[in-house]
Amino acid sequence: LYSDRKVVDNVNLNVKKGEVVGISGLMGAGRTELAMSLFGKSYGSNISGELYINGKKVQLNTVQEAIKNHLAYVTEDRKGNGLILSNPIKINTTLANLDAISRHTVIDKDKEYNVAVDYKNKLNTKCPTVEQNVGNLSGGNQQKVLLAKWMFTDPDILILDEPTRGIDVGAKYEIYCIINQLVAEGKSVIMISSELPEILG
């Protein structure tokens, strides 16, 4: 509708290894648009600016290029854009990195299953089996599968867009623990949230 409207203007962002940088603001402030424009220009048509990873200038014109450069974006809309609810956990977990579980474009079902079980255990996802459809999980466990999907791409930089929206207090705590673990491993995290206490830690 307003294709010429400038959504994000004159933003500088620095994120170090092992650091969480928080972005907060009201709905419509351009937080998600900024994140998606960084992640392979997946939002917007007139994107300008420069992006450096480890001091090296990179051009990320597609989502595939962003993933290859070890960037990950965990969307705020897990049901609409993040997960395929009618598919099992194992398929959703490996979806962003099919090359790692396939040979000559044929998926190794054992590898797919083992990767999903590994992340189920790592993130303490509560489900009887990774053969279960993601749509049957609670919000918190769906969010863990979404995180697992992007962790499996081995990113250096994770953009987490409202990672605790629509989940209970216990699941929120577990998500915070996962973020802390990622930071301890030297990952860089950009966290977007409309909850100021969450951003302030």
Task: Annotate each language-model stretch with its function.
Residues 1-201:
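Glycine-rich phosphate-binding loops of nucleotide-dependent enzymes
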